[in-house]
Curated annotation (Swiss-Prot):
Top-tier EC class: transferase
Keywords for the protein's UniProt record, in alphabetical order: Cell cycle, Cell division, Cell inner membrane, Cell membrane, Cell shape, Cell wall biogenesis/degradation, Magnesium, Membrane, Metal-binding, Peptidoglycan synthesis, Transferase, Transmembrane, Transmembrane helix
GO MF annotations in UniProt: metal ion binding; phospho-N-acetylmuramoyl-pentapeptide-transferase activity; UDP-N-acetylmuramoyl-L-alanyl-D-glutamyl-meso-2,6-diaminopimelyl-D-alanyl-D-alanine:undecaprenyl-phosphate transferase activity
EC number(s) recorded for this UniProt protein: 2.7.8.13
Residues passing through the membrane, by range: 22-42, 74-94, 95-115, 134-154, 168-188, 201-221, 240-260, 267-287, 292-312, 342-362
NCBIfam families per the UniProt record, alphabetical: mraY
Cellular compartments annotated: Cell inner membrane
Organism from which the protein derives: Francisella tularensis subsp. novicida (strain U112)
Names of required cofactors: Mg(2+)
Keyword Zinc-finger: no
Record's protein name: Phospho-N-acetylmuramoyl-pentapeptide-transferase
Primary role: Catalyzes the initial step of the lipid cycle reactions in the biosynthesis of the cell wall peptidoglycan: transfers peptidoglycan precursor phospho-MurNAc-pentapeptide from UDP-MurNAc-pentapeptide onto the lipid carrier undecaprenyl phosphate, yielding undecaprenyl-pyrophosphoryl-MurNAc-pentapeptide, known as lipid I.
PANTHER family linked to this entry: PHOSPHO-N-ACETYLMURAMOYL-PENTAPEPTIDE-TRANSFERASE, PHOSPHO-N-ACETYLMURAMOYL-PENTAPEPTIDE-TRANSFERASE HOMOLOG
Amino acid sequence: MLIYLFEWLSHYFKGLEVFSSYISVRIIMISITSLLITLALGRPMISWLQRMQIGQIVRDDGPQSHFSKRNTPTMGGVLILSSVIISCLLWGDLTSIYLWILILVVIFFGAIGFFDDYLKLVLKHPKGLRAKHKFALQSIFSIVLAIVLFYLLSKNGQMSLSIPFSKSLYIPMGIVIFVVLAFFIINGSSNAVNLTDGLDGLAIVPVVLVAAGLGIYAYIETNSTLANYLLFNYLGNPGLAEVAVFCAAVCGSGLAFLWFNSHPAEVFMGDVGSLTLGAVLGVIAVMVRQELIFFIMGLLFVVEALSVMLQVGSYKLRNGKRIFRMAPIHHHFELKGWPETKVVIRFWIISLILFLIGLAAIKVR
């Protein structure tokens, strides 16, 4: 909304047009806005969650150090999502259908995560929303969204899979392959980030890094000058540049949330945050046609999810034998004696390295 205000004011005050005409300025402003909103609302929300006794449930078979986390306020993801939506409504171009799609993803997956958390933490339902019901909701939405994105993106012929570190290698995709790939990316990312969110600050830093990386790609690919110079396919779809603005909002809010989520965590994001942020990253990767770059930058999430799949598979197929001491894999390292902070920081370092590798693919082609 503010871009329309500044556009009107620029007729009377010289210089204000930068806030409406330059997406780079809006990227900076939305990141600052989302950061400040999250910082401002963080303490009141934590206090409210404490009064409502909406606290973390800790597994009895987990690391003993986690027992101190019991009853730590949860569902802090509402803070992140609210900040992102408010910031986008303030600084986003509201004529962009891609921005509205991302906001819809936040609302839909946020509702699933919120209901799951509500069942577990408020109604004390031990398992929350049943896995099959959760997967069904995610799947229906992801398939419908994938079909919509196919028709939106295909208007400008942007239906090829970009291969990292290659100047001209693209794999064309029809609607079936596109929808299947998008389905697995969106659902897989949503659940992988959810599994990663098990230690203080562990998930939010990789989320911010991946969002920043995808935002950089979105900015390059929707700028004809940069895209041509760096030999990327120019994504000229009207409104697609707002993806970079949305990514900046996620980064700002995520960094501010880390202020409260760092060890010892004062609040956890819960399923309402992790499921939604994972889904959003997957949708963004599909929008900017950088699914493989997303795989590289988000490889930490992939490893966390694979560790759970391997653990479950081994337990069922090998008569109760496990590969890891506990899954997801971050708990395995805890049970090996690594302090929680060391696990988290080392995983952050890995995520930073993956982020830099993903950025290197911009120029190393």
